[in-house]
A protein has these predicted regions:
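Metal-dependent enolase-superfamily TIM-barrel catalytic cores that perform enediolate-based chemistry
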Residues: 114-152
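Short, low-complexity, polar/charged sequence segments that are solvent-exposed and flexible
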Residues: 17-21, 46-48, 56-60, 146-150
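N-terminal amphipathic alpha-helix/helix-capping segment at the start of soluble metabolic enzymes
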Residues: 1-3, 14, 20, 80, ...
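Generic detector of short, locally flexible boundary/turn motifs and exposed helical patches
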Residues: 1-6, 78-79, 90-95, 118-122, ...
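Metal- or metallocofactor-binding catalytic centers and their adjacent structured scaffolds
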Residues: 30-107
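Structured beta-strand/loop patches that form or line metal/cofactor-binding pockets in enzymes
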Residues: 1-37, 42-49
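Generic beta-strand structural signal
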Residues: 25, 92, 108, 123-129
Length: 152
């Protein structure tokens, strides 16, 4: 697990916090064939009670157990047996689980939505943007940038 800190160009404010950077954890899962899956989790003390340090500790504490999982069924069994632990570390688990799902899709050469029984994504995609609770002038400037980029 690697931590990721990316500074914002301007502070981002919402009801729970004001932040000057994003913090995330990245997990890399590798198969015996050398394929790599990546997963990300965003621990937030004010949302999940997690920190980057606690997510890293969760990963260090259980990595050896996950390494014995040879299938998604094994990982699901581990998750079921440790549901309370996962509930206390949801962002850390998200990074692990997403890395495993990404790897599974690559191993099967299928998009993960197909592997999980869905239909392949297609068509035009819509992206969203987030506006924080900054000063009105900053809010307005960012809104104009988003509108110019095609966000509606």
């Amino acid at each position: 697990m690697t931590s990721l800190d990316i500074p914002f160009r301007q502070a981002f404010t919402h009801a729970s916090a004001t932040r000057v950077k994003t913090e995330a954890v990245l997990v890399r899962a590798e198969s015996a064939r050398g394929l790599v899956g990546m997963g990300e989790g965003c621990p937030r003390q004010y949302v999940t009670g997690e920190t980057v340090a606690s997510a890293q500790e969760f990963f260090r504490s259980h990595r050896a157990e996950w390494m014995t999982c040879s299938s998604m069924d094994d990982l699901q069994t581990w998750g079921t047996a440790h549901a309370d632990l996962i509930d206390r570390n949801p962002a850390a688990w998200c990074a692990v689980e997403t890395a495993c799902l990404d790897l599974l899709g690559k191993e099967l050469e299928q998009p993960i939505e197909v592997v999980l029984g869905g239909t392949p994504l297609s068509g035009p995609f819509r992206y969203s943007a987030v506006l924080g609770g900054e000063k009105f002038s900053s809010f307005e400037k960012q809104l104009r940038q988003y509108l110019a980029a095609g966000f509606i």
